[in-house]
Each structure stands twice: as structure tokens, then as C-alpha cells.
């Protein structure tokens, strides 16, 4: 007969090796912060491309928080809280390289953080 403590220890060991995951709505602020973190990093890495896009599309504006985060090389995540989810979606999907560069990077970052999204 197997002792209950042995079963509990086995379950605890399995649970410790499994990655913790969280399922969140796409509009959840934690999802938005991951998306914005990837977005800011992409702007930093491809600044000239974003400047050219901005020049060609002057009505596509960025919240001041995003601009400050791009040029502040410290911890910028607290600057990005409070940006509306629809504005986050508009910014990140509004550039031509969204599906080739941003979407895969966002998916990877969310997965790395154990976050999976569901449609709102």
C-alpha cells in the first residue's frame, strides 16, 4: 500500500517541474505591458524605420509614455501602465512589420512569461 505522503510528494515534484501558466484576456493590462515592452524594444532596435513610418503616416501618433520609454533606457514598464488596450492594439498592429516581426516576438515573450491569451 502506497503511503499518502509518498503520493503527495510525487504530485508536488511533478507540479514543481511544470511551468506555471496564466490565461488572460488580450486586453488585460499584463498582456498589454508585455506587448508594449516588445514594441518599445523593437522601436529602439529599428528607430530609423519607425521614423520613416511616422513621416509617411503623420496621423499615426504614439502616446507620450511610449516616446519617453523609448528614450529612457532604465526600467520603463511603470511608464506604460494605463495606456488603453485599444490604443495598444492600434499601435502595434498599425505598422507594416507587425505580422513578420512584432507578432512573433510578442507571442514568444508572452509564452516565456507563461501567459496565454483568449479573445475578449
From Swiss-Prot:
It comes from the Eukaryota. One of its GO terms (biological process) is fungal-type cell wall organization. The keyword Oxidoreductase does not apply. Residues 1-20 form the signal peptide. One of its GO terms (molecular function) is structural constituent of cell wall. This is Seripauperin-6. Belongs to the SRP1/TIP1 family. Seripauperin subfamily. InterPro entries: SRP1_TIP1 (IPR000992), Yeast_SRP1/TIP1_CWP (IPR050788). Keywords: Signal. PROSITE patterns: SRP1_TIP1. It holds the Pfam family SRP1_TIP1. PANTHER family: CELL WALL PROTEIN CWP1-RELATED (PTHR31002:SF34), SERIPAUPERIN (PTHR31002). The keyword Signal applies. Coiled coil: none annotated. One of its GO terms (cellular component) is fungal-type vacuole.
